[in-house]
Amino acid sequence: MTPSEFRRSVRSGAFRGPTAGQCGPFAQANLAILPNAHAHDFLRFCHANPKACPLLGVGEPGAFRVDVLGADLDVRTDVPSYNVYRDGRLTERVDSLEALWRDDFVVFAIGCSFSFEDMLAREGIALRHIEEGRNVPMYRTSIPNRRAGIFGGQLVVSMRPLRGADAIRAVQITSRFPGVHGAPIHIGHPRALGIADLGAPDFGDAVTVRDDELPVFWACGVTPQTALMEAKLPLAIAHTPGYMLITDMTNASLAVF
């Protein structure tokens, strides 16, 4: 299935699940959508936190198409699930933004680690959340983001359990793709990140971690949602964690070496 065909299946309501493993060779994107009055500070926030918030594209005020991401793409309808934040609280999840859209909204598309999972799989590195049919586990850490204006919050990480040799290979592979979070930020000790229990993720689903495996943590594009919560904007929107926008960008085009 091409990205365009996949987006049409989301738009029609035929697909409503997490997007891990979908359209493997193509980049997936996290979304943050907020009023233009705060867009400059949010852009500064992304630039200040590039590991967690690598920008793939930014829309014009009011535009629900971002051409660099896909010619027929509509960010109001092409994501399986959206989080709606009001005054910093998650108030609802919706499957379309058409009724909420405003002409001052600015779209920020942020790289997603689902993008490099295809490369890991091609190298024979098994991914537990895909094996178990679950959403990837994500955790809010104790590490503060670099603040920009009203935007701060804490770093969020995704976790994939890997054997030692696979973890080393994963570092080598993902280092080539800083536009989708790049290399892991930590391997092995959840408490060093302020994570008390791997079995209780803040977002997504818990997965099995075997005795011969290490938890491998990547910076995660859910990080901006902690910033949106802290900023307490009257209205801001993001993707539901794990339910991404699939773009026409190839993963290969994002490699830096």
Curated annotation (Swiss-Prot):
Pfam families: D-Glu_cyclase. InterPro entries: D-Glu_cyclase, Putative_hydro-lyase, UPF0317. Its EC number is 4.2.1.-. Keywords: Lyase. The keyword Lyase applies. The keyword Hydrolase does not apply. GO terms for molecular function: lyase activity. HAMAP family: Hydro_lyase. Belongs to the D-glutamate cyclase family. This is Putative hydro-lyase Bcep1808_4029. It comes from Burkholderia vietnamiensis (strain G4 / LMG 22486) (Burkholderia cepacia (strain R1808)). The lineage of its organism: Bacteria, Pseudomonadati, Pseudomonadota, Betaproteobacteria, Burkholderiales.
